[in-house]
Amino acid sequence: MKYNPQAIEEKWQHIWEEKEMFRSEHGSDKPKYYVLEMFPYPSGNIHMGHVRNYSIGDVVARFKRMQGFNVLHPMGWDAFGLPAENAAIKHDTHPAKWTYSNIDNMRSQLKRLGYSYDWRRELATCDAEYYRWEQLFFLKFMEKGLIYRKKAPQNWCPKCNTVLANEQVIDGLCWRCDSVVEQRDLAQWFLRITSYAEELLADLEKLTGGWPDRVLTMQHNWIGKSVGAEIEFAVDGSDETVKVFTTRPDTVFGSTFMSIAPEHPLVEKLITGTGQEETVRAFVTRIRNMDRIERTADTLEKEGVFTGAYCINPLSGRRMPIYVANFVLAEYGTGAVMAVPAHDERDFEFARKYDLPMEVVIQPEGAELTPATMETAYTGQGTMVGSGQFSGLPNEEGKTKIAEWLEANGKGKRTVNYRLRDWNISRQRYWGAPIPVVYCEKCGIVPEKAENLPVRLPLDIKTRSDGRSPLGETPEFYECRCPACGEKARRETDTMDTFVESSWYFARYTSAGDNEAPFDAQALKYWLPVDQYIGGVEHAILHLLYARFFIKALRDCGYMDLDEPFANLLTQGMVLMDGAKMSKSKGNVVDPTEMISRYGADTVRLFCLFAAPPERDFDWSDSGIEGASRFVNRVWRLVEDLPAGMAPMAPCSSSSDDCTGAAAKDIRQKEHATVKKAGADIQNRFQFNTAISAVMELVNALYLTRDELGADEKGRRVLGSAVSSVLAMLAPITPHLCEELWEQLGHKDMLTARPWPRYDEDALLRDEVVIPVSVNGKLRSKMTVPAGTGKEELEKLALAEANVVRHTEGLTVRKVIVIPGKMVNVVAS
């Protein structure tokens, strides 16, 4: 019978679904294992990146089931967001209709690939029964003081007409549409992620070994902890003070001017009445609209403008001019910098440009620096000079002493600063979860009552082509009653950042379908944390950091007793075409549906898993998918062409008594060795490619010995056992093929429900081994010897080999290198 993948795959997908083979329940006596791939945005069609990601997860899920684990492997849809809204505008339809149609199509595509999902747990974040709980979390976070509203400079995408978090601005461009991001002052809702900065940083240690070092480093750097001091500088002739954060309080006596960010709240007060108003305002407007990455680049030309105001150095008493500078950022530290040009490179460059004074206050050992001769700032260690009572101290000691003085004299304090900023979750778009607050003239900002949730997104709306949200123009939505006083009020028309939905979906999977609470306490405790999370490294900062924060916040609200959501993380590589990322605009997209129709799902899965280790990128190639197809057909023919009347054998079930000849001994040893290697490669390193390669070698050996082994009953037992092991090992990778062939072998049970084969250590031992013999590093002979032959005997046998004798004739043997069981190398000259 010819291999017909479409018919076979449809058959077994139906059987698995009918028998609920992948249903999971908490409370089993088996150990639990929760494997999860990052859920997709329902764009309409899956791509090869999806196939690779989900195939990796499916192999892990199926393998763990075979190992005896109670496996949770769910799937859902990250369904809110700007792309759906923009697509709906483009196609003149509603985002909900567009989204749910795409979900239906993508679900069908995923089912065609035979992934072992528990589809009963499917969720879509745009479903009100999902985001009602998110709105409840919002209210709980408000009670905890973890959510607040403030007016602040925000990243604004003029094309998307919405605010972006700092993490969503890539090289000064919107992460979704690549438009140049502008700065606007807007009132927004923020999650106080900075309250967890220290815990987020410290708990990275718990993830060491389970997460890639690269991701841990990225999060460590993004959180960006700095230890230093906050110092207050009084504004001359005013009651105002400017606070600065510095990691170098030892250099405060060398501060000769102040630099503040264009966004600093004191700018207007400082310039009023100085005659500098127009100059400063023009500079501020220009710099605020600059690319944020450009403003932080080392190559940025330092620019500034004098405000006309001065401040007083609290230690030296120096009257220092205050400049607005392009390299100072409002979101880092306090938005103000005490400039120490002799000991900071940016300040040095700025001071030279604007002819500002320098004071050397740290002298290196064995040298004497002077401002006139310095060509660059000195940022190293040394002895403090020109620093009043602190002169003569090593500068590291001076840091502590000056910080103590500042605290004692009410001029500052020791403090820790973080690069991490609070998370802006307000979005001025329609297709998102409504923020559950109202604005009342009498009561102010009032949270919606929990019993009134969900605040539903109105579906009877018309999206706007200009990108503006229709919620602010839908009275049926925004007109409401104040939950506190009952008077007329206005509902918030911003929606939540879609990263909020993806920050807790993995927890909801444990209790999907529970309409009484966001989580079933027992199910949550049983399943979390996720044992293996799989997704792209591009989510290292955004999604993964937000999810870590969200779990800690939910913990502190009493929802769970958990510190970290994902015990282990695998960041898979991309699928490329000719070295470039696949994209429709480049015309280099490979359609998975077309490949499945041509080759079958198992072949597509096999190629994606065999092409490269999972963490590395790989190039799609027609020859590669053809090679995978040949191997699948080769396995099919191996079983199809077995001798008639063979009884079904369990994997690794033949005995040493069945091995009456060399071929049987060799196949039995190879079978057990392959089971050991493939299991270890999948279990320990997710090296599916090497596991598949090992099975391929066993299949090749079976083709060479099939006729010989099929000649007698004992040989057929060895053959049947090895073939069954091949199918069991390939079952997580090519499940439909293996299930069909398993049935053809006469087995009454389903391969999906069987355990992973168990190898026998004794079966791994060989009676004889083949030893390669080299002369001066070149292979000259191979000899078959009893296993365990010692060094002296191997040397003697090697030197007696005819081809070795011929290649050492007339030479003197200088050395014989022997590795028992492995190789012999004769060194002669």
Curated annotation (Swiss-Prot):
- Output the GO biological process annotations, alphabetical, semicolon-separated: leucyl-tRNA aminoacylation
The first-level EC class reads: ligase
The record's PANTHER family line, in alphabetical order, gives: LEUCINE--TRNA LIGASE, MITOCHONDRIAL (PTHR43740:SF2), LEUCYL-TRNA SYNTHETASE (PTHR43740)
State the name under which the record lists this protein: Leucine--tRNA ligase
Q: What keywords sit in the KW lines? A: Aminoacyl-tRNA synthetase, ATP-binding, Cytoplasm, Ligase, Nucleotide-binding, Protein biosynthesis
NCBIfam families linked to this entry: leuS_bact
Q: Does the keyword Isomerase apply?
A: no
- For this protein, the Enzyme Commission number is 6.1.1.4
Entry-linked PROSITE patterns: AA_TRNA_LIGASE_I
Gene symbol of the encoding locus: leuS
Q: Which InterPro entries match?
A: aa-tRNA-synth_I_CS, aa-tRNA-synth_Ia, Leu-tRNA-ligase, Leu_tRNA-synth_edit, M/V/L/I-tRNA-synth_anticd-bd, Methionyl/Leucyl_tRNA_Synth, Rossmann-like_a/b/a_fold, tRNAsynth_Ia_anticodon-bd
Chain ranges for the short sequence motif 'KMSKS' region as given in the UniProt record: 581-585
- Localization annotation: Cytoplasm
GO molecular-function terms, A-Z: aminoacyl-tRNA deacylase activity; ATP binding; leucine-tRNA ligase activity
Q: Which reaction does it catalyse?
A: tRNA(Leu) + L-leucine + ATP = L-leucyl-tRNA(Leu) + AMP + diphosphate
